């Protein structure tokens, strides 16, 4: 069983990611969205933590990591312009990424992701 986080829970595609996580026998530990999306979350993973501030999400992920509860994947369903920074955050923390399309908006961001994959050992799937 893999442990997931989700960034961007209120979007159109997020419920499909949540359904796929559940149907494949995995679990969602935490989610983040600037909009209150607890209703969406509760229909799939009522036990998951939920934050509306990225800083709180980061603090939770770091706390879990210190407790030996590292995440396996971050599913990114945030607005397109936030995909690159959210993937950068996950990769820097050694967490593999699943991202909705478009993956990035520029070739520079794509090159950066490749460098981060090599440097931190995590992958964009």
Per-region residue spans from a language model:
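Beta-loop-alpha module in the N-terminal Rossmann-like domain of NAD(P)-dependent dehydrogenases
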Residues: 50-116
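Short, Asp-centered acidic motifs that coordinate Mg2+ and/or phosphate
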Residues: 29-30, 72-73, 123
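Short loop-beta-helix segment that forms the pyridoxal 5′-phosphate
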Residues: 50-51, 123-125
């Amino acid at each position: 069983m893999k442990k997931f986080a989700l960034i961007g829970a209120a979007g159109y595609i997020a419920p499909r990611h949540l359904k796929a996580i559940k149907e494949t026998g995995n679990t969602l530990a935490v989610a983040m969205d600037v909009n209150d999306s607890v209703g969406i979350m509760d229909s799939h993973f009522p036990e998951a933590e939920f934050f509306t501030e990225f800083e709180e999400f980061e603090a939770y992920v770091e706390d879990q990591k210190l407790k030996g509860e590292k995440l396996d994947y971050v599913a990114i369903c945030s607005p397109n312009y936030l995909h690159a920074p959210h993937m950068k955050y996950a990769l820097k923390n050694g967490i593999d990424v699943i991202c909705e399309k478009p993956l990035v908006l520029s070739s520079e961001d794509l090159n950066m992701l490749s460098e981060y994959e090599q440097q931190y050992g995590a992958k964009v799937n």
